[in-house]
Swiss-Prot record:
Its EC number is 1.1.5.3. GO terms for cellular component: glycerol-3-phosphate dehydrogenase (FAD) complex. Belongs to the anaerobic G-3-P dehydrogenase subunit B family. It catalyses: a quinone + sn-glycerol 3-phosphate = dihydroxyacetone phosphate + a quinol. NCBIfam families: glycerol3P_GlpB, PRK05329.1-2, PRK05329.1-3. Its cofactor is FMN. This is Anaerobic glycerol-3-phosphate dehydrogenase subunit B. Keywords: Flavoprotein, FMN, Oxidoreductase. The lineage of its organism: Bacteria, Pseudomonadati, Pseudomonadota, Gammaproteobacteria, Vibrionales. Signal peptide: none annotated. HAMAP family: Glycerol3P_GlpB. Conversion of glycerol 3-phosphate to dihydroxyacetone. Uses fumarate or nitrate as electron acceptor. Pathway: Polyol metabolism; glycerol degradation via glycerol kinase pathway; glycerone phosphate from sn-glycerol 3-phosphate (anaerobic route): step 1/1.
Amino acid sequence: MMHYDVAVIGGGIAGYSAALRALQAGKKVVLINQGQSALHFSSGSIDVLGRLPDGSVVNQPFDALSALQQQVPEHPYSKVGRKNSEKGLMWFKRTLDSAHVPLHHEPDGANHWRITPLGTLKNTWLSQPFVYPYRGNADFSRIVIVAIDGYRDFQPAMLRDNLAQRPELANTPMLTVNVSIPGFEGFRRNPNELRSIDIARLLRQESAWNALCDQLMRVARPDDLVIMPAIMGNGDGLHLMTKLQQVTQLRFHEVPTMPPSLLGIRIEEALHRSFIQGGGVQLKGDKVIGGDFAGSRLTAIHTQNLRDFPISAEHYVMATGSYFSQGLQASQHAIQEPTFALDVQQNPDRAQWRHAQFIAAQSHPFMTFGVITDANLHPSRQGKTIDNLWCCGAMLSGYDPVFEGCGGGVAIATAYHAVEQILATYAQTKQPEVLL
């Protein structure tokens, strides 16, 4: 049997955050994840809280946590608390900074808007260096939207039309420019087959790189905001964006595209690299299929690939995600947590799972369904609390990450809080030194 201090189940942003925090504290950590995480579909920014459950727009996310606690006492943020939530987010920022993916937030702690691929504005709190933090006061003379010939996952006309409907941008000139990058012929079989990964590989060629720079400098000025799809990477995306800015002297705003999202991949690669370089053990491509319980403790877990070799740990952190990652499974009449059959908060009346209108002004109830935890994020199984198991991230009940704009923030805050409690147990059991 393989034994660890901490076993983390799930390799999304919550799982990696928990594993890294434990590893940084000197613990022996194993991370088990089934495959690619939802970070490959993400914006690459970290949303803390964009809207309260009653629909009120949030400007200062941490200040709003007291109002959130009054509205939803069982919200994950309500269990973690403001102080620990802030500590967790700042820890994550420092961790990514040290992994060469610096994230920025506004000096006053407020949310900023990021311009989305659809030309809408979305509240967020931490963004990557080439995501423009819009606060409603444009400090650019024009918006230049870059379309790349043959690239099908970016719709510049839609972005421009939606952005032009913003009252504060009504008098800001917007233009769309097409750029061609030589060398596409070897990557595609039809005119619109290219993906962001294809372009990223192509731009490693000097001729393609120089062609892109030359065309951008001809159509844009230093006082413009140049919006372009995230096509730089993978592995060296931020380095290439910095180089592009230095060569062209332009101000860029990267927008994520259809999957794979290079902005999200940057974060996952940074987390993975930090975990492996720090000495963590990762079982990638494996899946936890069950566990052994003794009283109120989880004593061992079993994986699909290591059926005859159970994994044991002093503490377990579970971050298997929601429906998308199969951390929760929905049948016609019930929601289940499939790995350990943990207790799930849900409404037994299927008709109450959603509103009559798909696009509604409020959260659909099923989005708040998830694993029930106590104030310390311990789940229960058949009504019995599991004392050495913590749950975090999208599998938790009591919140809607989409409606509230808080998915990344909750994932990081709950993972950090779970591991801080684990570390506290070691501090409590540490024997005092005897001075002779």
